[in-house]
């Protein structure tokens, strides 16, 4: 029995070498074994002797069993701990060495730099963009020059006295006047000095003429910028200036521009416009003769400039209150696109004050009517 148990214990230890350690406890119950005897017991002493022998045998077997169980448990734990501490893992890696590329026909070799294709494509695209930018710049510059040239030509056509013509006439009048002034001295140096001064003042005066009221009101500058000669006098030059001021400056007249005056949509009355619409007072000409100072430059007949205030009919029929017909009126309406000359005037015609006074003399006053009634009653 003990051999079998030891053999079983050794087999279990061999099977449990790689497992986890565990505590194994075994318990055995002693079973008495008796061998059958063929010989009968005849005496009482022999029977008691046999019982004592069996009891001692059973006790011995129980002690041996417990000793074997304890020894097997301790041996199992020791074997398991020894197996865990002695286990190890080792791996072997092979060292790979690539073969040499020399004399190998299957390896591609190149001498160009890396990214050559990208550099080539970028260079072509940049060249195209540069060509487009150059074409745009040249086209813009040519268009600017062409537009500036057309603008200057149109300005010279629309305003001949503001850009080129006025410049020439303006320079000519100053140069001629200076030459006339310095020619009486008989000195050529003074003549050249006056001509150089006229050229230096030319630019400043040209800008002033462009920004003056002459260009705003659109008057003709043929008279004032007419080049004088040596035979012309200062009186003729002053007459030209006076005629220029007479025929070019016109204000808004509600009687002449009847359509624009009646179509007003605002009830506001501007005092500035009313003052500007008043008859203009003429400035006496300091270069004219005394006879010309007393006459008006708007008519051909001799009429006093300041009428006699004691006679109302003269005041009513004075040239300042009558409609002035000058050659520049047609230009004024044509420039403003006004149809006042085409449509009849809606303003009532004025009758002379003398005629109205004569009509009033023939009428009867209320007192005269009462006197007639009283006379009839008597």
From Swiss-Prot:
<keyword id="KW-0926">Vacuole</keyword>
<dbReference type="InterPro" id="IPR051009">
    <property type="entry name" value="PRM"/>
</dbReference>
<feature type="compositionally biased region" description="Low complexity">
    <location>
        <begin position="25"/>
        <end position="41"/>
    </location>
</feature>
<feature type="region of interest" description="Disordered">
    <location>
        <begin position="18"/>
        <end position="70"/>
    </location>
</feature>
<keyword id="KW-0812">Transmembrane</keyword>
<protein>
    <recommendedName>
        <fullName>Vacuolar membrane protein CAGL0J10076g</fullName>
    </recommendedName>
</protein>
<feature type="compositionally biased region" description="Low complexity">
    <location>
        <begin position="343"/>
        <end position="356"/>
    </location>
</feature>
<keyword id="KW-0472">Membrane</keyword>
<feature type="compositionally biased region" description="Low complexity">
    <location>
        <begin position="48"/>
        <end position="70"/>
    </location>
</feature>
<comment type="similarity">
    <text>Belongs to the PRM5 family.</text>
</comment>
<dbReference type="GO" id="GO:0000324">
    <property type="term" value="C:fungal-type vacuole"/>
</dbReference>
<keyword id="KW-1133">Transmembrane helix</keyword>
<dbReference type="GO" id="GO:0005935">
    <property type="term" value="C:cellular bud neck"/>
</dbReference>
<feature type="transmembrane region" description="Helical">
    <location>
        <begin position="118"/>
        <end position="138"/>
    </location>
</feature>
<feature type="compositionally biased region" description="Basic residues">
    <location>
        <begin position="321"/>
        <end position="337"/>
    </location>
</feature>
<feature type="region of interest" description="Disordered">
    <location>
        <begin position="299"/>
        <end position="368"/>
    </location>
</feature>
<dbReference type="GO" id="GO:0005774">
    <property type="term" value="C:vacuolar membrane"/>
</dbReference>
